[in-house]
């Protein structure tokens, strides 16, 4: 029952007569509907219902939602015309008329997901409906506000709804403040502040904020930075503006806008998108530029904010972060193929063929219940026409926590990322990226055929910006993806966000490259906390530069990556070197031999949580594609795990045939491994194959094998002890001055620049020197006293010399490989071979030790032993001889004692050749000749 009140404060709400406001308080209307339509022409954000009376004509009409409820999320699509409210008084102050019971009612949506459109109208040039553009779940397709607008009347203190088309700022204190419902965002204020920011921002403001004496940028402090950016966007025809959010903090007028961007990204980013278009038009008109304005009107500009605060850990995200802008860092594990994501659904009536377009609201299609034509109004007659719908490119990326964000004793968390349009395929598995996006949650159906939802919601990040470069890491070698770029015909800058090198940085790089001690300077800068090991550091330095990957038109591809193995005694800093290289490589994976399996290194089959389909997950070697894979405890690997490395280290591919998935994956990575000798102590009296538990075919695939031995030397031990104790007293080693070590940021920038821009070509003089050095290394095996020649070098050593020479020339920023580059490569190869391929019995280099595990002398001794066994068996009177008697007679004819294991090995070889027959087992074994041969 309605009660009439005489209180003046309730008169406006309960009175059955419409309220006519004071005409003097009406704010001025702007001629340009840049942000709003009037209430009579827009798709209003206020919906009501009145079944008791007809409304008079000539007033503004607002569409009504049937059965509207404050608890329902409406669709952003067009709604059917139902009952109409009367809008009286000044335009924009909307109040409902009284119902039959004398009580007025409001029917509105708590949160409508509308946002700003383009500066042109929602109609095309010919007056026809135009499909609106929309980025991700951020709507920019309507000139109405993203949410319902509220007027706050300062005179009465009463909140009233407002759909005014005025965009002018309030000029009097008595005028209402217009904000988006549910937020503190004023569209007009936000637009004005961001426009002033774009037109007036200078880098001196950021310099003051950061309190830095030097700002790394190619602009002066007084230059209008974003004016230059907008002009470059217009000239290049691009539509994306990367916005450093900290610049908003540096500009005093946009400090509040920075916090609004973090808390209400869906609304603020839409306003920024529209403001950029208005600024582009203003720049063209004000400067009288000869440019087609229609092209600006039809283009969809996007703001991509980043650097919105410190990066959060994935396990720190909570419900308070939903619908807010966040920063995340992680490792890309997997990315799906491109998915067509429906943005605008197209419906057609099966009765009258009337069509209508419906925008998707948070992944939900608000299907029309009946035809919107008044003459038809047929229920359940609208059907979806797929080929008339609008779709956008979408990709889902699996992001995992990096080790620095994982607490002790915890397993890494992962989260799903959704990227759209230009960000699709912007990163690959193995990339370390920093993303900026909106944290969202969506309900999950208990059954796909029912509408029952689970109480737990699924979360994901709607990405607006992706950054892949760290100042302390190298950039990805673009030569590894050259073939992919040629096939896709895209610019590599769109695929990889490489580090921006300024003119000042380039001048410093040239200055360092001109130093005479460049080679030793860069080598000292590699792991400066590790004492000495100069040759090891030089080899790793050349590995970071790498050779040049070559693909020939006649077929065939030659790798430019360099593989290095560190072998030696414990406590010789092998693992620390691996850790340092892993920290500065862009796509490196650090793993241990004992904790790795074959599928963990290559790829494995798993079932996707979302689609329930079998998918291929990348392993450590695939994730290191284009980087360096560091493997510690290489000798502890199982045989099945090591077998997969043979193809990777030479062909740089991984062949997979599992669960119906047959494919070949790229593994174009360098291998840096470390191994401990058998018994944890290297025995110099044994060859390298007997000291290291590695098969010879795998050992021969390493370009450089360094023996890091712990030798007793009083002078060296004293210097090493001083170095270690100084590390506990200061962060910088005592024997190295500040000028002798380059900062890690500059070192990575130098290497990245060389890998990106320097591709040396081998000259004729270098070619002649390579041939001469290779032939000279082969001649080292000549021995006039022996019929069989020792192999001291193979073609793999020649290819290794070519790669090292290219890396040395690339280090000096030279476009050609000269004689000195080849000489240094030959020196490194000979130094490494001298250590690990020397026969301890003869003191000579023998590559058979590395390739077959046996030297020429050992092979000759085994042949002589087999010949002696055959002679003993032929000279005996009986048909067979016991094994113990055979050992006794062999030792009688030999000057040196022959071990039973050597005799057993010789018998096994003779038995395989069907020359002898061994009967029995153990000490009862007997040996006789095979007379049938």
UniProtKB/Swiss-Prot annotation:
Residues 1-149, 154-173 are annotated as: Disordered. Its main location: nucleus. Residues 518-725 form the MCM domain. Keywords: ATP-binding, Cell cycle, DNA replication, DNA-binding, Helicase, Hydrolase, Nucleotide-binding, Nucleus, Phosphoprotein. It is an enzyme of class 3 (hydrolase). The keyword Nuclease does not apply. Belongs to the MCM family. This is DNA replication licensing factor MCM4. The gene is MCM4.
